[in-house]
């Protein structure tokens, strides 16, 4: 992952976006702040889907446990 500061990113935005389009993740740092990461839309959507899948799996595990407890009463 490439890591650059905000000023460099702003001055080279076209190049940064070209790198992201080519599949690279770019971290942008700002003095005293949490860094941000730029990724392609496809990568971002894959991350979101994975997070939602994990959340649904957790919910289904909870529901399954609850159902088993109710059946075994």
Swiss-Prot record:
The concentration of phd in P1 lysogens is far greater than that of the toxin it antagonizes. Such an excess may assure the well-being of carriers of the addicting plasmid. Residues 50-73 are annotated as: Sufficient for antitoxin activity, its presence prevents formation of a doc-EF-Tu complex. Changing residue 48 to M: Decreases repressor activity, binds DNA less well, inhibits doc normally. This is Antitoxin phd. One of its GO terms (cellular component) is protein-DNA complex. Antitoxin component of a type II toxin-antitoxin (TA) system. A labile antitoxin that binds to cognate doc toxin and neutralizes its ability to phosphorylate host EF-Tu. Does not reverse phosphorylation. Bacteriophage P1 lysogenizes bacteria as a low-copy number plasmid; phd and doc proteins function in unison to stabilize plasmid number by inducing a lethal response to P1 plasmid prophage loss. Degraded by the ClpXP protease. It comes from Escherichia phage P1. NCBIfam families: phd_fam. Coiled coil: none annotated. GO terms for biological process: negative regulation of DNA-templated transcription. Pfam families: PhdYeFM_antitox. Keywords: Repressor, Toxin-antitoxin system, Transcription, Transcription regulation. Homodimer. Interacts with cognate toxin doc, the exact ratio of doc:phd varies from 1:1 to 1:3. Interaction with doc prevents both kinase activity and dephosphorylation of EF-Tu. Belongs to the phD/YefM antitoxin family. GO terms for molecular function: DNA binding; DNA-binding transcription repressor activity; protein homodimerization activity; sequence-specific DNA binding; toxin sequestering activity.
């Amino acid at each position: 992952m490439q890591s650059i500061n905000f000023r460099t990113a702003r001055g080279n935005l076209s190049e940064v976006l070209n790198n992201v389009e080519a599949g690279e993740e770019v971290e942008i740092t700002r003095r005293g702040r949490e860094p941000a990461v730029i990724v392609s839309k496809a990568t971002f959507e894959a991350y979101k889907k994975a997070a939602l899948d994990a959340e649904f799996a957790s919910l289904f595990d909870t529901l399954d446990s609850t159902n088993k407890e109710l059946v075994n009463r």
